Amino acid sequence: MSTRYKFSGNNLFGQWFLNEPILEKFQLVSKNHGLDFKLMHMSWSHNVFQSKNAIYVSGAWDNNENVVKRLDLFFGVELKATDLLAAGNDDFFYVVDVKRLTIWIMHHEFDKTFTFYPLDLKFTLGKMEKENNDIEIVKMIVSNKSVYFLTNKGCIFTGIPPIYLDTRHCLGRVCDVACGYEHCILLTDFGHVYTWGSGKRFQLGHGDIEDIDKPQEVDALAGIKITKIAAGGYHCLALSEFGDAYTWGWNDEGQLGILDNVEHPSIENPIQYSIPKLIDIYDENGEIVTIDIVDIACGSKHSALKLADNTVWTSGYNKYGQLGLSSKMFPSVKYFRKVYESCINFKIMCGIWCTVIETTSN
């Protein structure tokens, strides 16, 4: 199985193995040092990827740039890189063994090596479930302030040491979780969406700016089965089973991609939307596009959609070319524009200041 990536956006630290500091159109990322890699994590200054049974970091690391370095984590413990998850923020970098429930942590400024901790999730889950065997971590994400773990039992833990986040009031089992800078969003297998955290930029979708300390359902989506969620810096996207996408939160750079006035697209849209709003996509002639949306992704201040015809549409902040457009011609885009199309299937992902297209072949 071979994975290939096309990338547009910030490469200021050489994290994408390319010479140009900014890529304003999607360009194929070639193998570096002969490594066939699988991307694990994107930050604004470095990437983490798996190659065979090892984990590497590329970009800015240990006060250097254009680094490609194998991470030495394991202190003689034999592990499979396929059993590991990696993520980080400006302060800490985390690597988790999803099966052994252990974590390695490094502080970017003060640490030169990783510190090992056990994650005692089974003890906590044992208080709630009779059967707590075969627990695995299926996703790890980080916000500016914390780290979150989602297990195959649908439980969320936060912090080090991990504390159980009570989601027993949620309708269905938690199947996904995402974080912005100061807020979080989760999805259940019943298609219900819940948010919590800071609401000061309307990113929670509850119609106000109140902060919430535990997951609360987004009422405007309660009658719609949602199949995927994404979180930007201060905004969210949600994809429905019918191929519609909804968005809400901060819109200072057009990251919500909403065009309220089709006849006069130059008119500024509101800087925020406090509840989810249906996204309409328009072609270059101003005609509405009726093709289903099949994938969504969020960066810090931009968003990306994939349609069923294998096209990618982006909107929002474009200082680093993360929309796949010229940053001089389009410093920001206020509504979704088509920027890429392909005859083969692919996935879309967004880093903080980049957009990535991933294809997999045998």
State where each predicted segment sits.
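Eukaryote-biased RCC1-like beta-propeller repeat architecture
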Residues: 1-362
